[in-house]
């Protein structure tokens, strides 16, 4: 049975016991209800036995309170371990976080001299000499509107054959050099493009590996979150920091370039939840430890109450048995008032001694009820013994009514100490035990009142 159920049963028994105390007083003072006294006494005894069993169940070596405290201590240790693992994972995840692209090279980055490529433009030397030889205005660079035929006619008139051949050779050399340099640049460009393609493929591959590592970390974070949710349910904790999405949903939606504020917000929420959960567990442990101490003290008190009540019952039962025996052995079924008063006074004195040793309201009330009815009987006996009547002296009405309700062996069996049924086994009633819901429900007082009346 769970701790809360046991505590609930204990409260029900206490409520029912309080009702029985009132019924006990009423039954003792009402002649018409005298037949119910034995049943009510048994119910009170059963309730006290049940309270003793419940307290034993709570405070024993492996009692419910100690088990609950042990469970909470394990929950606290689990929470601390989960938080430690979670913080390590968040720290590791941060180390895998890719910052936004930057143009700045690392501080330890050194350029390899062999990687420096010099681009030449030798064709420009030949080309410049050609332009100087013929003149820029006599080339297609000129903005003149003259036709090519007119330019060619002027050049032919001003240049000799050797000059023209030399200019032609300069153009050939420049052309050859330009083609050679273009080929070199195109080759270099192809190499650059090939390198760039390789870089892009490697970026994808490395990005995938980084995502895989982060995904693995996120997976473990989600598992920790599931464990923390289960722990929250066990300790009855509801986070005041509600989120639109669960941590798992948010965590798997993170990108490599996720905003730092999401990361920081998640860490803040986790840390606050951890602090709240830890505080709640510690408060529960403290409360249960106080309960344990309180119940240990109550166990001693309830045991004392039960023993006093059993002593009271035994003494009253012995008195009733003696009176019944004397009534049977008497020739006219009568007992002299003085003799009866002595027997009752002896019991009253014993009950007074019990009251002196008790400072608990429950047993004080119950024993006082039993003593008071005996005192009243003594007063009636004393009154009758001092007032002569015709014929034989009449016995007091109340004691006679109580005792005559027990006949033969039934009277003796009713005065025996009732055996206590198994704990929480309501089906073994009558009498009903203190934890029966049918007895301690909202209508229990009416039902029991009808029983007495």
UniProtKB/Swiss-Prot annotation:
<feature type="compositionally biased region" description="Polar residues">
    <location>
        <begin position="384"/>
        <end position="395"/>
    </location>
</feature>
<feature type="region of interest" description="Disordered">
    <location>
        <begin position="380"/>
        <end position="428"/>
    </location>
</feature>
<feature type="coiled-coil region">
    <location>
        <begin position="144"/>
        <end position="213"/>
    </location>
</feature>
<keyword id="KW-0813">Transport</keyword>
<keyword id="KW-0653">Protein transport</keyword>
<keyword id="KW-0072">Autophagy</keyword>
<keyword id="KW-0963">Cytoplasm</keyword>
<keyword id="KW-0472">Membrane</keyword>
<comment type="function">
    <text>Required for cytoplasm to vacuole transport (Cvt) vesicle formation and efficient autophagy. Plays a role in ATG protein retrieval from the pre-autophagosomal structure (PAS) and is especially required for autophagy-dependent cycling of ATG9. Also plays a role in regulation of filamentous growth.</text>
</comment>
<protein>
    <recommendedName>
        <fullName>Autophagy-related protein 23</fullName>
    </recommendedName>
</protein>
<dbReference type="GO" id="GO:0006914">
    <property type="term" value="P:autophagy"/>
</dbReference>
<dbReference type="GO" id="GO:0034045">
    <property type="term" value="C:phagophore assembly site membrane"/>
</dbReference>
<feature type="region of interest" description="Disordered">
    <location>
        <begin position="434"/>
        <end position="453"/>
    </location>
</feature>
<comment type="similarity">
    <text>Belongs to the ATG23 family.</text>
</comment>
<dbReference type="GO" id="GO:0015031">
    <property type="term" value="P:protein transport"/>
</dbReference>
<feature type="compositionally biased region" description="Polar residues">
    <location>
        <begin position="408"/>
        <end position="422"/>
    </location>
</feature>
<keyword id="KW-0175">Coiled coil</keyword>
<comment type="subunit">
    <text>Forms a complex with ATG9 and ATG27.</text>
</comment>
């Amino acid at each position: 049975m769970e701790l809360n159920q046991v505590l609930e049963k204990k409260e029900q028994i206490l409520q029912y016991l309080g009702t029985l105390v009132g019924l006990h007083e009423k039954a003792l003072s009402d002649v018409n209800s005298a037949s119910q006294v034995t049943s009510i006494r048994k119910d009170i005894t059963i309730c006290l036995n049940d309270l003793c069993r419940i307290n034993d169940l709570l405070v024993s070596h492996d009692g419910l309170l100690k088990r609950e405290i042990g469970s909470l201590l394990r929950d606290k240790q689990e929470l601390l371990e989960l938080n430690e693992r979670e913080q390590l994972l968040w720290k590791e995840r941060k180390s895998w976080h890719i910052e936004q692209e930057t143009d700045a090279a690392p501080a330890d980055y050194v350029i390899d001299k062999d990687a420096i490529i010099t681009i030449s433009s030798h064709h420009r030397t030949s080309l410049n000499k050609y332009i100087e030889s013929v003149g820029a205005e006599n080339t297609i660079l000129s903005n003149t509107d003259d036709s090519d035929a007119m330019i060619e006619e002027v050049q032919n008139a001003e240049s000799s054959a050797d000059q023209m051949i030399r200019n032609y050779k300069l153009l050939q050399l420049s052309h050859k050099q330009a083609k050679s340099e273009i080929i070199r640049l195109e080759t270099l460009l192809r190499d650059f493009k090939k390198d760039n393609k390789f870089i892009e493929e490697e970026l994808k591959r490395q990005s995938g590996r980084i995502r895989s590592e982060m995904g693995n970390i996120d997976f473990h974070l989600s598992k920790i979150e599931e464990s923390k949710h289960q722990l929250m349910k066990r300790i009855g904790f509801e986070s005041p920091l509600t989120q639109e999405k669960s941590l798992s949903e948010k965590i798997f939606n993170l990108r490599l370039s996720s905003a730092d504020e999401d990361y920081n917000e998640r860490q803040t929420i986790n840390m606050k939840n951890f602090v709240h959960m830890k505080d709640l567990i510690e408060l529960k442990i403290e409360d249960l430890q106080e309960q344990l101490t309180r119940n240990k003290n109550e166990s001693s008190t309830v045991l004392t109450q039960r023993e006093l009540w059993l002593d009271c019952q035994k003494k009253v039962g012995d008195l009733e048995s003696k009176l019944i025996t004397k009534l049977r052995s008497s020739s006219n079924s009568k007992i002299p008032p003085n003799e009866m008063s002595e027997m009752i006074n002896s019991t009253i004195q014993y009950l007074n001694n019990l009251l002196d040793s008790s400072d608990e309201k429950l047993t004080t009330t119950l024993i006082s009820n039993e003593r008071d009815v005996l005192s009243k009987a003594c007063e009636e006996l004393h009154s009758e013994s001092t007032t002569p009547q015709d014929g034989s002296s009449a016995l007091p009405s109340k004691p006679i009514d109580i005792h005559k309700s027990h006949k033969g062996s039934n009277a003796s069996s009713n005065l025996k100490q009732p055996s206590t049924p198994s704990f929480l086994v309501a089906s073994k009633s009558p009498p009903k035990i203190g934890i029966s819901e049918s007895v301690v429900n909202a209508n229990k007082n009416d039902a029991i009142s009808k029983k007495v009346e």
